[in-house]
Amino acid sequence: MKSRLFIISQYLLPHHLLSRLAGCIAECRVRWFKNAFTAWFAKRYQVNMSEALVEDLSAYEHFNAFFTRALKPGARPLDETPGAILCPADGAVSQLGPIEHGRIFQAKGHGFSAQELLGGDPAMAAPFMGGEFATIYLSPKDYHRVHMPLAGTLREMVYVPGRLFSVNQTTAENVPELFARNERVVCLFDTERGPMAVVLVGAMIVASIETVWAGLVTPPKRELKTFRYDEASRTPIHLEKGAELGRFKLGSTAIVLFGPEQVKWAESLGAGSAVRMGQQLAAPAQA
């Protein structure tokens, strides 16, 4: 009954208004408030501050600075296995596996269209048909910067407007097409394993999504917008494996897509597996 009421509330709540209000609170610089709120959050979610570059909670100018905190050098060593594809973020594997008939598995009885996830462009989605996906959920206690699974050159970024349903196991099991309905930022790279998409999916009270090349991407105007980076007039944007790609201000999900016969997921990983940025997520499927 409780989960049913929760799902009903997800359709009724003003997602974007609540998220913008959360963003205002998270950017509040009133010292007593931001210190008290940050301390409460760190205790409530058992955030490990010993690995943070700045351990003193009161040193952060606002809650968002704490939430997107940098880590100490070496806190997330990169797997050195030749050809390793790295996990882009701390969190847990929500699902991973093949993209079958253009669909990505969400939870029992639910899936969503890879084409819709990527913004609806058939040409962008075509290289991923029959490929592989991995969905990584970032919990409140996690490190909230997203990094490159492989070295790549940015080809395209797409902002896709949408709802802001909460992202958790309950919504994954009850909200159809969840990740293809929420607001998201699609980043398309050319890599040694062919095209790679990294999709940063928003959620309720996710105040904004940033990338290292564009800065703040959300919240923009409520329309789909495509940014091309492969034009001759632009300086190429190349990011090395393990380099920061972007960050969430208040959390959610990163989805990585590869084309067919390019990667093989680590056998130790499955739905629910805890992961850390920099560990091996997959290996090349072929030499």
Swiss-Prot record:
InterPro entries associated with the record: PS_Dcarbxylase, PSD-B, PSD_type1_pro
Pathway assigned to this chain's UniProt record: Phospholipid metabolism; phosphatidylethanolamine biosynthesis; phosphatidylethanolamine from CDP-diacylglycerol: step 2/2
Catalyzed chemical reaction(s): a 1,2-diacyl-sn-glycero-3-phospho-L-serine + H(+) = a 1,2-diacyl-sn-glycero-3-phosphoethanolamine + CO2
Site (Cleavage (non-hydrolytic)): G251, S252
Domain of life: Bacteria
Location of the protein in the cell: Cell membrane
Required cofactor(s): pyruvate
Cofactor annotation comment: Binds 1 pyruvoyl group covalently per subunit.
Gene Ontology cellular-component annotations: plasma membrane
Gene Ontology molecular function: phosphatidylserine decarboxylase activity
A biological process from GO: phosphatidylethanolamine biosynthetic process
Top EC class for this record: lyase
Keywords, in A-Z order: Cell membrane, Decarboxylase, Lipid biosynthesis, Lipid metabolism, Lyase, Membrane, Phospholipid biosynthesis, Phospholipid metabolism, Pyruvate, Zymogen
EC number: 4.1.1.65
Main location: membrane
In-chain residues carrying the UniProt-annotated modification Pyruvic acid (Ser): S252
Family annotation (Pfam families): PS_Dcarbxylase
Catalytic residues of the enzyme: D90 (charge relay system), H147 (charge relay system), S252 (charge relay system), S252 (schiff-base intermediate with substrate)
Record note on modification: Is synthesized initially as an inactive proenzyme. Formation of the active enzyme involves a self-maturation process in which the active site pyruvoyl group is generated from an internal serine residue via an autocatalytic post-translational modification. Two non-identical subunits are generated from the proenzyme in this reaction, and the pyruvate is formed at the N-terminus of the alpha chain, which is derived from the carboxyl end of the proenzyme.
Membrane topology: Peripheral membrane protein
Family to which this protein belongs: Belongs to the phosphatidylserine decarboxylase family. PSD-B subfamily. Prokaryotic type I sub-subfamily.
Assembly and binders: Heterodimer of a large membrane-associated beta subunit and a small pyruvoyl-containing alpha subunit.
Task performed by this protein: Catalyzes the formation of phosphatidylethanolamine (PtdEtn) from phosphatidylserine (PtdSer).
Name of the molecule in the record: Phosphatidylserine decarboxylase proenzyme
Gene: psd
